[in-house]
Amino acid sequence: MISRYTRKAVPQSVELKGLTKHALNHHPLPERLDDISSTNNSHGKDTSSHSESDITQESPITSTDTGNSNSRSAFPSYAGTGVSTEGSSDFSWGYGELDQNATEKVQAMFTAIDELLYEQQLSAHTQGLQKECQQWAASFPHLRILGRQIITPSEGYGLYPRSPSAVSASHEATLSQERESTIFGIRGKKLHFSSSYKPSPTIKASGLCAVGGEEADCIIFSEGVIEEYLAFDHTDMEEGFHGNKSEAATEKQKLGYPPIAPFHCMKEDVLAHVFDNVWSKAVGCMEQLTRSHWEGCASDDESNVEITRLDSGSPYVLNEQHPLVLPRVPQSKVPSITSSPMSFCQASGHQPNVSGLLIHGMPLQPRNLSLMDKLLDLDDKLLTRPGSSSVLSNRNWPNRAMELSTSSLSYTTQSARRRNPPPRTLHPISTSHSRAGTPWPVEEILRGPRVPVTADTLSSPSPMTLGRNNLLPPIGTVEVEHLSAMGPQRPTKSHGDSSRARSAVVDEPNQQPQERLLLPVFSRPNTTQSFLPDTQYRSSCASEYPHQARPGRGSAGPQSHGSTKPQSRGGPISRTRQ
């Protein structure tokens, strides 16, 4: 047994030189070849002789000195299988004979099939094959052999015959007599993915049990729940619509399936091409309109007219009229802007916007301007009536002062300018005129111990400061002449006295009281004379000399202007230096 593993395969050249006799001595030849050939002759003489001739021609040992039968029997497996080591094995003779018999039978079967299909020759094997095919067709109706296979089948596809006579039931029943043997193909049951396809009744086999047209719904055995996820191009849409093809088509479009059919592809391409052209034109028109509108708002009137003019040669410009350019707003409806830079910017900012819009040219007014005008007009009516100054009590003044102080300075000056033609600013008073309007004994009294009391009362303003708005009784001209004669006696005086003299003189009668309160830069400062207990004398000083305030302000020099300016900002602290 050990020597089996040391043997090598005998080459073909050595076998041809005479080693076959040595192999024959160890393995005597049994006479079985004649028995095999006799069994083949019982089935058909022509088939066995033809198969033996084919095997003999294919055998590579036909050139040996021995006969054809001896060479095949010496190496039976080499002629059939090609394994050369089986000739030297003790147990290989039986295996080789079985392989040889099986090979010869299969080869004879294929030869008979080829003769039947291509040469129309009938034999014993061919008759057996026909009976077997009929049994297969009756037992397995889903797969039948009809003829020649044209294309390679794939899952989900079916082959259609060239003529309807090829799939008739009579041809299936009598397959060996009536069917066309030149056509070879595989026909099976088609999966009905489309609802428009109606299965033909000729597809059903004759040997099947009558199911009544529900062959696809027949369930042989089922257990449990099976879920299948299939992906295919076309869905059965008539299950929910019951034959309404229009609703099925609309529902298919809503499902979002990609356009597979050539018609849908062409439709989508045409729509995309048309949409691109229309959208490009629409974007061009919108670009022209937007550019003309916004550039017109940012530029002045002359450049605005040039930019907003439509270009007739542009392909994106529609046939429409030019935008309406509204006229300028009359100056009577525009508030005065000469005194306030903020109002000038606001009024000039509205003018370019009007030219590009189809709106009425109304200048925007501030929110508090109408309220201020109403309050100021109410004050004018109350002041012009006799005895109406007492109506302006302390409960109205502080609230209105807080409300009007938050507004802009330009709005107050504009409303005052419309009512008061004279200038609003208070120019500094010269020293000579200020001395002429204030008596000397009053200045000596103001220098006294009343200054600390004034500093204390300025921290919390007293309602007595509003008392000078009341109407004053008339004063005789004798006292006026006496006081005017006493004025020029003291021409040289300090700046503190000049400020007191200026504070003793009331502003112009046309100037309103609220302007003096809200405009501290342009009005005179509060002094200690406002808090004197002698109201009668203070009122006489305030009302007797309105004619001396104007020439004093008009002839003021730069020296007096510089001296009074810091005093008006400093308050009572700067007046106590002397």
UniProtKB/Swiss-Prot annotation:
Highest taxon listed in the record's lineage: Eukaryota
Subcellular location(s) of the protein: Cell projection, Cilium
Keyword hit for Ligase: no
Biased composition range(s): Basic and acidic residues: 43-53
Chief location bin: other
Compositionally biased residues, Polar residues: 54-74, 524-542, 557-567
Subunit structure, as described in the record: Interacts with TBC1D32; may play a role in cilium assembly.
Function per UniProt: Involved in the localization of proteins to the cilium and cilium assembly. Indirectly regulates the signaling functions of the cilium, being required for normal SHH/smoothened signaling and proper development.
Protein name according to UniProt: Primary cilium assembly protein FAM149B1
